Amino acid sequence: MQGVQEQIEELQTKLAFQELTVEELNQEVIKLNRLVAYQQHQIQLLVGKLQAMEPSNIATQAEETPPPHY
């Protein structure tokens, strides 16, 4: 059976590793939040460009006449 001091040291070691893991995960969350914000900005730019585009002269599928073999 371990002594009380050994148990305390083991718990302190586990706590130190958990604190390190929490900090590493926190840094990953921060990076992912920045990435999501960047991607949202890029999507907004693309939506703006799509909305600003002139309508195409190409007919839509609904406007096309069916091919002769129908």
UniProtKB/Swiss-Prot annotation:
Domain of life, source organism: Bacteria
Similarity comment: Belongs to the SlyX family.
Name used for this protein in its record: Protein SlyX homolog
Name of encoding gene: slyX
